[in-house]
Amino acid sequence: MPFEFDVITLLPDMFDAVTQHGVTGRAHKSNLYRLHTWNPRNYAMNHYRTVDDSPYGGGPGMVMMAEPLDKAITDAKARQGEDGVSKTRVIYLSPQGKRLDHKKVLQISQLDGVVLLCGRYEGIDERLIEDQVDEEISIGDYVISGGELAAMVLIDAVVRQLPGALGDTRSAGQDSHTDHLLEYPHYTRPEVHKEKPVPRILLSGDHAKIERWRLQQSIGRTWLKRPDLLAEKYPEGLPDREKELLEEFKQLRYRVVANQLMDNTKEQEQ
């Protein structure tokens, strides 16, 4: 059964970018998932199709009204039920939500479907959140104009985890954050670019050495850029093998930095 995304949004056309392009476009064409949009304006209570109003207590901006959203979510959940979806959640994309990470993406991908609620304006009537929303999710500590872009990020991340979505079944497993490690660097042709050659080991054909180098680079990059991930993966400290690889990475890095300093000094002397 395909994964079911039902999106509550005032801008349904935005999601054509998901269903028509790239990995998510191919997965949609292969019926690995289905995406339905529900426009709250179709549930508005007047002929102006009004879905927002001024906030009680005063203040700037407008607030999305509960009733049109409530009806849209109810219909979305009913449609999922008719299609056999038994495990689903209503997720509100909100800067107040828990930060989306790989663990959460995997949890969502194990469901049969989700209803994604995209807010606009100053926010959504709190009573709707209390009655209908199971979980709030944020894609970062910043504010964007609406929940649509955040919903598309979540959809893309979840679709990548669906069996058959990626051409190479190893791809999702090697992505950064999959194993609490950042991904190793990638290289392709030409062999030399602006006097910078591809690391010699990648041309050796020795797969065991290549895998070791890639693990070394993953550990080293994580140590440099996201040490918090290393602490999370190894709360009691690095195992001996990983510790050895990290020391090798540090030595290589220090050597590169030292050579660069020497080159800069020579240029200044000239």
From Swiss-Prot:
| Catalytic activity reported | guanosine(37) in tRNA + S-adenosyl-L-methionine = N(1)-methylguanosine(37) in tRNA + S-adenosyl-L-homocysteine + H(+)
Q: Where in the cell is it found?
A: Cytoplasm
Q: Which Pfam families match?
A: tRNA_m1G_MT
Q: Which residues bind S-adenosyl-L-methionine?
A: 119, 139-144
Per the record, the coiled-coil ranges are none
Q: Name one GO biological process term.
A: tRNA N1-guanine methylation
Provide the E.C. number(s) assigned to this enzyme.
2.1.1.228
Q: Name one GO molecular function term.
A: tRNA (guanine(37)-N1)-methyltransferase activity
In terms of Gene3D superfamilies, this protein maps to:
3.40.1280.10, tRNA(m1g37)methyltransferase, domain 2
Q: Where primarily located? A: cytoplasm
Q: Which UniProt keywords apply?
A: Cytoplasm, Methyltransferase, S-adenosyl-L-methionine, Transferase, tRNA processing
Q: What family does the Swiss-Prot or TrEMBL record give for this protein? A: Belongs to the RNA methyltransferase TrmD family.
Protein name per Swiss-Prot or TrEMBL: tRNA (guanine-N(1)-)-methyltransferase
Q: Whose protein is this, by species? A: Nitrosomonas europaea (strain ATCC 19718 / CIP 103999 / KCTC 2705 / NBRC 14298)
